[in-house]
């Protein structure tokens, strides 16, 4: 963890903090490259290969979600606003030792993410439930991934419509519909389980 070594908040709160300071620190560079510009090329590949929360959740036994996707994705917007308001309030109230608070927010925030993620995975029997419904970072990733250069597409000449791709997808993406307009087209994490 670079954040622990550098004592810097690498989560979304750290991005807001350094952005408001006008500082080009590791968190702002990380978000700019991996989560704002990166999805234009790799979609949500970050989620499938580099996200530390997703990596821990993938160790759980619920790799193939059994249930349909719930309609509670609005929670990610609430989490996004909470992270933004948390940092704004630190500036408004001129909190002392803000660097120390941001570092502890990084540690505590990660623990909370893991606890919520593991609890949701067990409750919904779905490793990636946190990613689908709670993760505020997807607010950055989803719009850019809509225009992603790298996409998994269905070869309709070989497809026999067995739906194995859908049944193996941890994000419930319907790969039969490979148009950019598919409802869940920005959800693909390029895990390649469908291939």
Language model regions located:
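Non-ligating segments of multi-cofactor redox enzymes
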Residues: 1-177, 186
């Amino acid at each position: 963890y670079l954040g622990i070594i550098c004592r810097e908040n690498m989560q979304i709160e750290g991005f807001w903090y350094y952005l408001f300071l006008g500082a080009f620190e590791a968190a702002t560079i990380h978000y700019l490259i991996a989560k704002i510009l990166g999805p234009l090329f790799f979609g949500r590949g970050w989620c499938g290969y580099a996200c530390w929360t997703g990596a821990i959740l993938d160790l759980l036994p619920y790799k193939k979600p059994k249930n349909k996707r719930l309609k509670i994705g609005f929670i990610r917007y609430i989490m996004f606003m909470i992270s933004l308001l948390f940092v704004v309030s630190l500036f408004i109230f001129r909190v002392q030792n803000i660097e120390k608070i941001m570092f502890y927010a990084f540690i505590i925030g990660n623990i909370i993410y893991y606890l919520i993620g593991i609890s949701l995975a067990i409750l919904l029997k779905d490793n990636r439930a946190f990613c689908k419904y709670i993760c505020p970072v997807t607010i950055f990733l989803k719009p850019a991934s809509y225009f992603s250069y790298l996409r998994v597409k269905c070869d309709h000449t070989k497809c026999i419509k067995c739906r194995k791709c859908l049944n193996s997808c941890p994000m419930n993406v319907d790969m039969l519909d490979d148009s950019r307009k598919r409802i869940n087209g920005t959800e693909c994490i390029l895990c390649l389980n469908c291939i």
